[in-house]
């Protein structure tokens, strides 16, 4: 456990390094501390913090920078939040009112503002699958001698359309297949369809030619309802951080943004501050050993259609207080908590 003075020194170093991207010297710490303490004491405490792996010493400078452990302690114990900027709050509210109640549009607009302010890339990921979403109807509609359409209607009113080329599959076989699908899968939750296909396959094998093509096409279409829709906003803002002048680091962060599933990354055990909503803040090696220079701040927003994840990705040296507070503000506005408190 850190002493009160050590905690203050760590807080000063983290805050100053976030602002300047420069190692923080003992002299600078002394200037920033709001307590009277000698430079020798600061050097001793800084050395102790380094020994405990809260700080790292840069070879090119006499100053120190935060380690992942130092950032984590800062986020968990030292991070403070300013009063909300009223103009920002009103701006976000106006977006909400203009866009109605469609949360995905609200988040895409709000995420652009957050990205510009934090210099982090914002990712809005909508998880389409509602836990109660079911297949309600499957219809076959012949369009011509060579083409037919299969319509899947889901319990939320959403429709999926799949075209079949009748040169590859006969209309008769397609009709038989759709009847089998309807008999076995209507009123089945979408999330369970993959598991139920094994029950359908033997029947298709014995009654339908090219059953594997029909089955593969059917599954690829219906499973689209389970896929997450991802919108990446503000990549250029993140690139303003000098950390991403390194091509290798940039390649890694782009790869994670393109391939990550925020729903898998989200972990409430990394909650940033118990006074706020559940916001997961992962730093460096907490994400992966290969991503030691990256941070992820995110939260899950529940809707009637499922969940939407708001994720911020940036370098390890970001303003965690600002990122957490902005996410918290957006969720408050979306949930209506802001109006309750007025």
From Swiss-Prot:
Protein name: Heat-inducible transcription repressor HrcA
Signal peptide: none
GO molecular function: DNA binding
GO annotation terms (biological process): negative regulation of DNA-templated transcription
Keyword set, alphabetical order: Repressor, Stress response, Transcription, Transcription regulation
Transcription as UniProt keyword: yes
Organism: Mesoplasma florum (strain ATCC 33453 / NBRC 100688 / NCTC 11704 / L1)
Family classification: Belongs to the HrcA family.
Function: Negative regulator of class I heat shock genes (grpE-dnaK-dnaJ and groELS operons). Prevents heat-shock induction of these operons.
Gene that encodes the chain: hrcA
InterPro entries hit by this protein: GAF-like_dom_sf (IPR029016), HrcA (IPR002571), HrcA_C (IPR021153), WH-like_DNA-bd_sf (IPR036388), WH_DNA-bd_sf (IPR036390), WHTH_HrcA_DNA-bd (IPR005104), WHTH_transcript_rep_HrcA_IDD (IPR023120)
NCBIfam families: hrcA (TIGR00331)
A Pfam entry, by short name: HrcA_DNA-bdg
């Amino acid at each position: 456990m850190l002493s009160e003075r050590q905690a203050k020194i760590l807080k000063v170093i983290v805050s100053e390094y976030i602002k300047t991207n420069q190692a923080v010297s003992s002299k600078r710490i002394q200037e920033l501390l709001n307590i009277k303490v000698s430079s020798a004491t600061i050097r001793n405490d800084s050395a102790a913090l380094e020994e405990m792996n809260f700080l790292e010493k840069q070879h090119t400078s006499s100053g120190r920078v935060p380690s992942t452990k130092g950032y984590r302690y800062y986020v968990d114990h030292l991070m403070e939040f300013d009063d909300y900027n009223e103009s920002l709050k009103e701006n976000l509210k106006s977006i909400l009112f203009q866009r109605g109640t469609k949360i995905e549009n609200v988040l895409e607009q709000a995420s652009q503002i957050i990205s510009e302010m934090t210099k982090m890339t914002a990712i809005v990921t909508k998880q389409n699958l509602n836990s109660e979403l079911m297949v309600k109807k499957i219809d076959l509609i012949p369009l011509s001698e060579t083409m037919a359409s299969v319509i899947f209607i889901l319990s939320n009113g959403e429709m999926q359309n799949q075209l079949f080329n009748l040169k590859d599959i006969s209309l008769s076989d397609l009709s038989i297949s759709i009847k089998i699908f309807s008999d076995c899968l209507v009123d089945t939750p979408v999330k369970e369809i993959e598991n139920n296909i094994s029950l359908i396959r033997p029947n298709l094998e014995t009654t339908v030619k090219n059953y594997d093509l029909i089955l593969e096409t059917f599954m690829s279409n219906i499973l689209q309802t389970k896929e997450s829709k991802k919108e990446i906003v503000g990549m250029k803002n993140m690139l303003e951080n000098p950390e991403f002048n390194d091509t290798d680091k940039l390649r890694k962060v782009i790869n994670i943004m393109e391939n990550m599933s925020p729903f898998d990354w989200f972990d409430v055990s990394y909650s940033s501050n118990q006074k706020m909503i559940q916001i997961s803040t992962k730093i460096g090696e907490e994400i992966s050993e290969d991503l030691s220079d990256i941070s992820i701040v995110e939260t899950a927003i529940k809707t009637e259609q499922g969940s939407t994840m708001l994720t911020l990705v940036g370098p390890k040296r970001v303003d965690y207080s600002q990122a957490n507070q902005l996410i918290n503000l957006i969720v408050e506005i979306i949930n209506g908590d802001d109006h309750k408190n007025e």
